[in-house]
Amino acid sequence: MFDFSLEAIVYAKAISLLATVAVVMMWLFYYCYRLKQKNEVIFGTHHAAYIAYSVCIIAWISSNAYFHTDLLPELGASAGMFMAKFANLASFFAFAFAYYFSCQLAAEQRKGKVHRWQQGIFVSLTVYSLFINLRPGLTVEHVDIVGPSQFIIEFGPHTSYFFIGLVSFVVLTLVNLVAMRTNSSKLTLAKTNYMIAGILVFMLSTAVIHLGMTYFMGDFSLTWLPPALSISEMLFVGYALLTSRFYSVKYIAYLALSVLLVCAIFVLPLGAIFIPLTESNQWLIAIPICALIGITWQLLYKKTSRYASFLIYGDKKTPVQQILSLEEDFKLSIDDAMRRLGKLLQIPNDKLRLVTSNYNETFYEEYLSSNRSVLVFDELSEELEYKVSAKRSMKALYDKMSSNNTALVMPLFGQGKSVTHLLISPHKSNNQMFSNEEISAVQTLLTRVQSTIEADRRIRQSRALANSIAHEMRNPLAQVQLQFEALKQHIENHAPVEQITLDIENGQAAIQRGRQLIDIILREVSDSSPEHEPIAMTSIHKAVDQAVSHYGFENEKIIERIRLPQHTDFVAKLNETLFNFVIFNLIRNAIYYFDSYPDSQIEISTKTGPYENTLIFRDTGPGIDETISHKIFDDFFSYQKSGGSGLGLGYCQRVMRSFGGRIECKSKLGTFTEFHLYFPVVPNAPKADTLRTPYFNDWKQNKRSNEHKVAPNVQINNQSPTVLIVDDKEVQRALVQMYLNQLGVNSLQANNGENAVEVFKANHVDLILMDVQMPVMNGFDASQRIKELSPQTPIVALSGESGERELDMINKLMDGRLEKPTTLNALRHVLGNWLNKNTASSACEAERE
């Protein structure tokens, strides 16, 4: 009677095969669990074929394990013949279902069904295989048994045809997978590469050993190896089916080579010691050897992996290690570290961006959850292609990333798991996908440097505050200085009291404008959340009128270029103070270009809808390039505007979100810019008329009454030298013009660099006072062009710039520098230096002529 005990299977080959069975079974259970989690359909899809293939692999490995146990000699030749035929059928059906699995995949890719001829091949070969293996003597005639792992199978006459059928399935499977690569996406290519790799390892090992060594050479000692290697196909194919993120070929080769090198270090010396020992002594020394391997593995792996990296990548550090080593670089300079990171990821120059999550978070936050911590464009493409249910929810995200040429969005989570920053990357320059090891390495790196990034953000915030206040305050200070000069002249000329009072009021208005600018800037850089501010229902017309009436305009000419909403009022729930600052920001951005674009205007209008109402703020200035329009709500982003904090529009977005709405930008370069402020419809709201007050309708008249034009038109004196004043701010030009009048010098004005070149060509100019930062054309470019026309004409920078680069450019392109706002004495000194030199130079040239 047969007596089974564990000792019957305690053989290295049998244990290896049974361990493989355990791994495959666990993988199969996990695979089915993931399908259930994802609510995937199994029957009628490639999943059913893959599961059937996996079951056949388990049966095949188990039947092969039988031949390497004591069960083989104990049960005899008849049981051996049965298990040999069972192994034949298990391996055949594994190959057959692998083939049908590839047919099903190809059919799903083309959105069709498996071809009839493919089904015919599957059925016909299956019937034939069952026939020749179930009928005695056709594939296996006899099994000669010596002991475990020591046996010879005598094949029947149909064995060669049986193996031809297996080879046919291998070839047809590879043909299907290779055909799937044609006109496929990058993600589909990666999936098929993984599947082909797994199938090749398994099927080639089977073909070489089962066909070559057993059938032709009669050696059955290695028949256990193909079943053990079948795990490669299981894992590679299953991984490709379950995931959309893959490790690169080089990284897999690096890991494999590192492990092989460590194994070689252990096997060669330890094998020389272990093999000569008797079987009883081998077990005694096995335990300390295992302990030695466990203790030293990590150290040896760390050492040998450097050489593996050098062989694979040509560098002792892998790209993953190089990415993680950027941690110290981030502490020195985030911008430089981001450039190096972009280079390692093969991103085009300076296209990799780390932005705060003001605008983008509102769009991406619903997708950036714990189960989707990274948004990858290629993965979205696959979901839209294969999952009909995902199309509605994912289409908008796909279109957004596609329009912005975005390939990767990775969040940084702060306290409370809220998104603080977003790493946004375009597609790689080599058009490859982001590999799994790259994404994991970048995630780890950003987690490590998050505190550094947050500290840098606060430092930038402080710098932006200081820079913005310093820049913005120059204009109101110049206005105050201008009013003091005018007041001084009026007192000396014994002007009436009314005129002196008006000068004082104008000076006070300039001071108030300065205070307002400081309040706006402090609001921009504040970390306080607008969500906690109280909100109330109000008429949008009233809110706009009130905000505009409180804005500190420099002169009445600006007021004349603003059109307020006249029709379609609606009720909005908002905080008036916060809303005022939103309007202030939009007005300030628009009027910045008024001097350079004299025909530009501001038009504010409204539009109602069933779910949300819209306030449209339109200016017909320079417009915004479409390629950067999506960046304008990012913190510290400034476009064609010097001295700004780059925080204003991000603040506007936060405020609008606190109202339950949002702000969006629509622009056409060179034509217009529109900001659409969306407010949710207020249910059961009273009529807007009842919330409106007529008080603010006369805001233009109130503003005009306090405006006074200080600088009169100047008559050109042909006997006096002429100075060209170039500045985009009228108040700065007016102040310099007043000083030049007092010094008896003629003046011409230009509001940007391009205008300055035109004025210079049309008039005789002895000296140019040139601002640096201006729209349309800056002072550096204008100076370069003017110097090409007239190298002798002195150009003095009229600027408050203090940056190292700007000062270096001033020294290279200009002849001197005046602080802005300037003073009478400073201007007199410059005129004394340059006008005398220039007059002498002109006289010498005239004498030569």
Curated annotation (Swiss-Prot):
Residues 722-835 form the Response regulatory domain. PROSITE patterns: HIS_KIN, RESPONSE_REGULATORY. Its main location: membrane. PANTHER family: HYBRID SIGNAL TRANSDUCTION HISTIDINE KINASE C, TWO-COMPONENT HISTIDINE KINASE. At low cell density, in the absence of AI-1 (autoinducer 1), LuxN has a kinase activity and autophosphorylates on His-471. The phosphoryl group is then transferred on Asp-771 of the response regulator domain. The phosphoryl group is transferred to LuxU, and ultimately to LuxO. At high cell density, in the presence of AI-1, the kinase activity is inactivated, and the response regulator domain has a phosphatase activity. LuxN phosphatase acts on itself. The gene is luxN. It comes from Vibrio harveyi (Beneckea harveyi). Its EC number is 2.7.13.3, 3.1.3.-. The modification 4-aspartylphosphate is found at D771. It catalyses: ATP + protein L-histidine = ADP + protein N-phospho-L-histidine. InterPro entries: CheY-like_superfamily, HATPase_C_sf, His_kinase_dom, HisK_dim/P_dom, HisK_dim/P_sf, Sig_transdc_His_kin-like_C, Sig_transdc_resp-reg_receiver. The modification Phosphohistidine is found at H471. It is found in: Cell inner membrane. The chain crosses the membrane at residues 9-29, 41-61, 160-180, 196-216, 220-242, 251-275, 283-301. SUPFAM superfamilies: ATPase domain of HSP90 chaperone/DNA topoisomerase II/histidine kinase, CheY-like, Homodimeric domain of signal transducing histidine kinase. GO terms for cellular component: plasma membrane. NCBIfam families: LuxN_Vibrio (NF041945). It is a multi-pass membrane protein. The keyword Cell inner membrane applies. It comes from the Bacteria. Keywords: ATP-binding, Cell inner membrane, Cell membrane, Hydrolase, Kinase, Membrane, Nucleotide-binding, Phosphoprotein, Protein phosphatase, Transferase, Transmembrane, Transmembrane helix, Two-component regulatory system. This is Autoinducer 1 sensor kinase/phosphatase LuxN. Residues 468-683 form the Histidine kinase domain.
